[in-house]
Regions:
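Glycine-rich portal/gate segments that line the openings of hydrophobic small-molecule binding cavities
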Residues: 20, 30-78, 131-144
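Well-ordered beta-strand positions in beta-sheet-rich domains
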Residues: 1, 55-61, 84-86
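Solvent-exposed residues in well-ordered beta-strands and their adjoining turns
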Residues: 1-5, 44-48, 63-65, 76, ...
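Hydrophobic pocket/interface hotspot
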Residues: 9-13, 19, 62, 89, ...
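Hydrophobic ligand-binding cavity/cleft-lining segments
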Residues: 1-40
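Beta-strand/loop substructures that line and gate deep hydrophobic ligand-binding cavities in soluble
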Residues: 74-127, 137
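Amphipathic alpha-helical protein-protein interaction surfaces
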Residues: 15-18, 94, 130
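Short amphipathic alpha-helical segments
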Residues: 5-11, 54, 125, 129, ...
């Protein structure tokens, strides 16, 4: 639960270019192409493992649907190519519930793609980065 107005939470979550300033695990975020309500965005983040940080990188098509209070991503480059992500924001008493749903069959690697996604890439990298991102969005939105 994020204890902030839903419009503020949506604004912080959608303002991806500011993420490196408010989320220490993001290396950079830049729009490669802007369109009304989103565009093509390149993102790079660190996945920390204690003192070691593993670099990650991907490009997504991003759509911000303010009416539905959703932010959708379709990963188009990087190891997570073809992954669909949706952030859903729902106003509830006392704040905003945010869910992040990732749908992905895994990389197109013969024999091991789905297994690698299920055992390593999803739980270790995707969940590791997404959970830190959501925690940082919460902290920033509640402070603003």
């Amino acid at each position: 639960m994020i204890r902030a107005p839903i419009d503020r939470v949506l604004q912080v979550a959608a303002d991806v270019e500011r993420w490196p300033q408010i989320l220490s695990h993001y290396r950079w975020v830049r729009f490669l192409e802007r369109r009304n309500g989103g565009g093509t965005v390149e993102m790079a983040a660190w996945r920390p493992f204690g003192a070691f940080r593993y670099p990650t990188w991907w490009v997504s098509e991003m759509i911000v649907d303010r009416g539905a209070r959703e932010i959708r991503y379709r990963h188009v480059r990087g190891i997570t190519r073809r992954m669909d992500v949706v952030w859903r924001l729902v106003a509830e008493p006392g704040g905003v519930a945010v869910t992040i749903v990732h749908e992905w069959a895994g990389p197109a690697w013969p024999f091991i793609g789905a297994l690698a996604a299920r055992l390593v890439i999803g739980p270790v990298f995707i969940h590791g980065i997404a959970s830190r991102t959501l925690a940082g969005i919460k902290k920033h939105a509640e402070r603003a």
